[in-house]
């Protein structure tokens, strides 16, 4: 457990060209419960590893970088530090940087968790009583944090890494089951909207 104004990191890459379009500042969080065989960053899995950093210091470092066209939050599993990652993502968008978030969870499960928590919270507040349905179905994910991180993400790369589906031909994904989801468009339309890319040049979503 880390203080609310901190984030536990596996590391950073201030000039990544493989974690989304353009030159990006990649932030790799520490801790992941998925345990995908063939994981690219297995040392990022233990929750007690890495180093704890203040979010405001990390945000200042990214702002001072000056070259990054966007920020990618990867890991590890960002949604297992959803509150901290959401705060970082909000600050990055306030700077005019687009945010990509990688997760081993599926968008539908994260959205359902966030929506169910919001609905249950409203019912509990109205009746002043807790409800068993408030318990999240993803025990390692904070429901309100999941909602906040989804709201602060432009593109979500979702789904676990599946070694049998691995291909080096996939842009910004490790396996073909993973999707590049335009989160603002998806949340507006109520259906999955994939982020459009061309072979040579990534299209910028209208929501950016």
Region roles according to the model:
Residues 5-10, 23, 41-136:
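Conserved Radical SAM active-site core
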Residues 80, 164-165:
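Short glycine-rich, flexible loops that bind phosphorylated cofactors or substrates
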Residues 1-28, 41-47, 192-193, 197-206:
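N-terminal [4Fe-4S]-dependent radical SAM core
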Residues 28-35:
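Short pre-active-site segment immediately N-terminal to redox-active cysteine/selenocysteine motifs
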Residues 166-208:
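P-loop/Walker A phosphate-binding loop and immediately adjacent motor/lid segment at beta-alpha junctions
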Residues 153-155:
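Well-ordered beta-strand positions
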């Amino acid at each position: 457990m880390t203080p609310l104004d901190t984030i536990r990191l596996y590391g950073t890459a201030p000039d990544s060209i493989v974690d989304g379009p353009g030159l990006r500042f990649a932030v790799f969080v520490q801790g992941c419960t998925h345990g995908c065989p063939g994981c690219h960053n297995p040392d990022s899995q233990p929750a007690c590893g890495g180093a704890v950093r203040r979010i405001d210091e990390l945000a200042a470092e990214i702002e001072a970088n000056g070259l990054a066209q966007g920020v990618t939050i990867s890991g590890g599993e960002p949604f297992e530090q959803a509150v901290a990652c959401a705060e970082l993502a909000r600050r990055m968008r306030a700077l005019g940087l687009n945010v990509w978030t990688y997760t081993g969870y599926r968008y539908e499960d994260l959205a359902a968790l966030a929506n169910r928590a919001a609905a249950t919270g409203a019912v509990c507040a109205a009746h002043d009583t807790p409800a068993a349905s408030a318990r999240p179905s993803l025990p390692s994910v904070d429901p309100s944090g999941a909602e906040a991180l989804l709201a602060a993400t432009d593109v979500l790369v979702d789904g676990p890494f599946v070694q049998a589906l691995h291909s080096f031909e996939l842009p910004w994904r490790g396996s073909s089951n993973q999707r590049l989801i335009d989160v603002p468009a998806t949340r507006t339309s109520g259906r999955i909207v994939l982020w459009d890319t061309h072979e040579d040049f990534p299209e910028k979503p209208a929501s950016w």
